[in-house]
From Swiss-Prot:
Name of the molecule in the record: RNA demethylase ALKBH5
A Pfam family it matches: 2OG-FeII_Oxy_2
Regulation: RNA demethylase activity is inhibited following sumoylation. Inhibition is relieved following desumoylation.
Gene assigned in the entry: ALKBH5
Organism listed in the record: Homo sapiens (Human)
Chain residue ranges for the region called Disordered: 1-26, 48-83, 299-394
UniProt domain comment: The C-terminal disordered region undergoes liquid-liquid phase separation (LLPS) for the formation of paraspeckle membraneless compartment.
Amino acid sequence: MAAASGYTDLREKLKSMTSRDNYKAGSREAAAAAAAAVAAAAAAAAAAEPYPVSGAKRKYQEDSDPERSDYEEQQLQKEEEARKVKSGIRQMRLFSQDECAKIEARIDEVVSRAEKGLYNEHTVDRAPLRNKYFFGEGYTYGAQLQKRGPGQERLYPPGDVDEIPEWVHQLVIQKLVEHRVIPEGFVNSAVINDYQPGGCIVSHVDPIHIFERPIVSVSFFSDSALCFGCKFQFKPIRVSEPVLSLPVRRGSVTVLSGYAADEITHCIRPQDIKERRAVIILRKTRLDAPRLETKSLSSSVLPPSYASDRLSGNNRDPALKPKRSHRKADPDAAHRPRILEMDKEENRRSVLLPTHRRRGSFSSENYWRKSYESSEDCSEAAGSPARKVKMRRH
């Protein structure tokens, strides 16, 4: 059988079969090595060029990189500014619930006395959903000035506002001195801001030429938030996202200095006043702060020394225009920007329009109606016949 198959010996047949198996195994190993080499080359090519086939994907990635870097840069800038703001803020919880209740009862007494007219004229400043009560020192701001803008604020003459109530010294200032928040004798100006739900105050910086730093405030009645770096837009009212929103709890003390007090604005947003809230602001006026020296600014007859009294240092004090609102606010008043405190549109109109057209005195519609009626009365009294006036359309 071995001879028929061409092999003379069975050992020769086995030997020939072994060599063939070795050849097949060697072929498989070579193929595997070749496949591994191809895979390695493909991986190297992929690492050198992430998208070797589709150029559109690579182009999209290149285009999106600058956008992502700009966004990241803006976020870094915002975080850096927020860090600067935080560096100028100190907060502490000093007043217990019982102490808050005592102080809040005193604030209610201030409101009651103001409603009875027991304070000086410049002590009380009313606005829809927000009343301010100045003690010790008061100053002009916002629509009260003929020339508006930073640096135009002036202190009232001494005695034009009431003295700081004794309870503010005993219940508030003394506790701050004991905890070394402020030094003894630092405070000579106390302002109580009383907010109703939806009330607000637009972004501002406390006048640097009027007040020393730090600025100390104590919150009562409810929790709220103090926002930094917001931009207000009116009609309809909108408020941009703040650089930093600082929670302000009932009974907490907030101290502003440095960047937080001088380099960025702060505000109270309408959405952050959900319940009645009051804040007592304690400050010290600068020795060189400009001051109004005359006590009868609205009088038509002025003393001969008025011109010299108007001067405070090298600054001439602008005439005051009393523009206070005594209207009671309805619940929707916060959404009517025309009556908000320091309304920019109102300020612009009062500067551009002539005196008889300004809304602070009376509406233009009522003015022209009254003028027309008075002219008719005069013509009838004089006995002159009525004239027909042809109105020209423009």
